[in-house]
């Protein structure tokens, strides 16, 4: 019988153990929720209040700063006035400092429009005859002074718009009208001189000792062609004969007949052109078509040779007269 009671006691203990543990867990859960609630309530304040240590305090109003904390929930802290004309606060806050007033810098063209108060910062504007077209405005620029009238006056946010000088514009047009014919005349004179310089090579004259002149216009170029070819590049020779009527097929034939002889190619091209052109005006045609420096070289070659021939002829005549 006693054994039965022992077994019943053990069963009761095993059943009651889990029940007591569940009850304790339930109580712990309640306490945990309550703790969370208490912590949340402790860390939050109503809208418009701020947390200062363990109290929710009112902010200081505009124009004041905090000088001491509040003593209980919902109370106002100790607030003192900002320094008039030097500091301000324009909103409710809980800072222990006021904001310094801005300064309107006269050197940047600014002046005071509204003085700084405890609740409002200084308001600046441009001085008279100054403007500022940027925001925020940090400096103002001087307005433009118009010499020939104003279209729009200078404002604090825009510069003056000036009229153009009609007389000045008329003067410019008149000057331009005068310059155009002058420039054209100068251009024609320069071109004429350039043409005359080229013609000089055609009309150059070699003077002998007796002062007689020899015109080079119709000089026979036949014996000078090798010397002229030496002064010219093959590309210059081909370009010259091509521009002066030689057919491309003829040029190709001469080039192929003297494939490895550039010097001979130049001579044959010039000689073929000369035979086709004829003696008359051949010298002028050649020198007019060439660059100035090259034309001068050819002119020197021809004139020196003709001068030497004339001198030799004179010496021969003198010797014959002596005999």
From Swiss-Prot:
Biological processes per GO annotation: activation-induced cell death of T cells; immune response; motor neuron apoptotic process; necroptotic signaling pathway; negative regulation of apoptotic process; regulation of stress-activated MAPK cascade
Keywords (A to Z) from UniProt: Apoptosis, Calmodulin-binding, Cell membrane, Disulfide bond, Glycoprotein, Lipoprotein, Membrane, Palmitate, Receptor, Repeat, Signal, Transmembrane, Transmembrane helix
Main location as per UniProt: membrane
Pfam family membership, one: TNFR_c6
UniProt-annotated location(s): Cell membrane; Membrane raft
Cited CDD domains: Death_FAS_TNFRSF6, TNFRSF6
InterPro entries, A to Z: DEATH-like_dom_sf, Death_dom, Fas_rcpt, TNFR/NGFR_Cys_rich_reg, TNFRSF6_death, TNFRSF6_N
Membrane topology according to the record: Single-pass type I membrane protein
Start and end residues of each Death domain: 238-306
Annotated glycosylation sites: 38, 115
Tissue expression summary: Detected in peripheral blood lymphocytes, thymus, spleen, lung and ovary.
PTM statement from Swiss-Prot or TrEMBL: Palmitoylated. Palmitoylation by ZDHHC7 prevents the lysosomal degradation of FAS regulating its expression at the plasma membrane.
Region (Interaction with HIPK3): 204-305
Keyword check for Plastid: no
Region of interest called Interaction with CALM, as start-end residue ranges on this chain: 222-246
SUPFAM superfamilies: DEATH domain, TNF receptor-like
PROSITE patterns cross-referenced by the UniProt entry: DEATH_DOMAIN, TNFR_NGFR_1, TNFR_NGFR_2
Cytoplasmic side: 189-323
Record remark on domains: Contains a death domain involved in the binding of FADD, and maybe to other cytosolic adapter proteins.
Function text: Receptor for TNFSF6/FASLG. The adapter molecule FADD recruits caspase-8 to the activated receptor. The resulting death-inducing signaling complex (DISC) performs caspase-8 proteolytic activation which initiates the subsequent cascade of caspases (aspartate-specific cysteine proteases) mediating apoptosis. FAS-mediated apoptosis may have a role in the induction of peripheral tolerance, in the antigen-stimulated suicide of mature T-cells, or both.
Protein name: Tumor necrosis factor receptor superfamily member 6
Organism: Bos taurus
UniProt gene name: FAS
